[in-house]
C-alpha cells in the first residue's frame, strides 16, 4: 500500500501530518504536483513534478495507483476515479470518500459549479482550522491501523 497526495492544493499542515505518519508507520508517500515540491528527506517520502496543465497531477495519480492505495485529495472527480480503481480517497478535512457517498459528492460538486458559473456563489470552502486538521489526523490513523501492515 502507498499514499498518494494531490499536492498542488494540499494544505501544508496536512502535508506535515502525512510526513510524520509516513515515517512513523513506514509507508511510502508520494506527493504529485505541477510545481516543485521539496519534501523532507526520508526513505518513505518522495515527490513527482508533472507538466503544468489541466489535471496533470490527477492523471499521474490515477495512472500509477494500485488497488488499495490511499489518495489524499479534495478533488471530487479524482476521488471518484480512485474509488473506481479500487483505491481509497481521503480529503484534507478528514472525510473518507466511499462508493456509497461518491454519487452525492459528485452531484453536490456539479451543483455548486453551476451556482458559481451563474454568479450565485463565490469563493470556496473556509480555511482549514485546527478541528479539521485533527479530524484528518484521526481518520488517517484509523485508516492506516486498519489497512496498512508495516514492514517488519
UniProtKB/Swiss-Prot annotation:
This is UPF0178 protein AM1_1179. HAMAP family: UPF0178 (MF_00489). Belongs to the UPF0178 family. It comes from the Bacteria. Transmembrane segments: none annotated.
Amino acid at each position: 500500500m502507498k499514499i498518494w497526495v494531490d499536492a498542488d492544493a494540499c494544505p501544508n499542515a496536512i502535508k506535515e501530518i502525512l510526513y510524520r505518519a509516513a515515517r512513523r508507520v513506514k509507508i511510502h508517500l508520494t506527493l504529485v504536483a505541477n510545481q516543485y515540491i521539496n519534501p523532507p528527506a526520508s526513505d518513505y517520502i518522495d515527490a513527482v513534478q508533472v507538466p503544468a496543465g489541466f489535471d496533470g497531477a490527477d492523471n499521474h495519480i490515477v495512472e500509477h495507483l494500485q488497488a488499495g492505495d490511499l489518495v489524499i485529495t479534495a478533488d471530487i472527480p479524482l476521488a471518484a476515479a480512485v474509488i473506481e480503481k479500487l483505491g481509497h480517497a481521503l480529503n484534507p478535512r478528514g472525510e473518507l470518500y466511499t462508493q456509497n457517498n461518491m454519487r452525492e459528492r459528485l452531484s453536490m460538486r456539479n451543483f455548486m459549479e453551476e451556482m458559481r458559473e451563474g454568479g450565485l456563489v463565490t469563493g470556496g470552502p473556509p480555511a482549514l482550522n485546527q478541528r479539521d486538521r485533527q479530524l484528518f489526523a484521526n481518520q488517517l490513523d484509523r485508516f492506516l491501523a486498519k489497512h496498512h501492515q508495516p514492514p517488519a
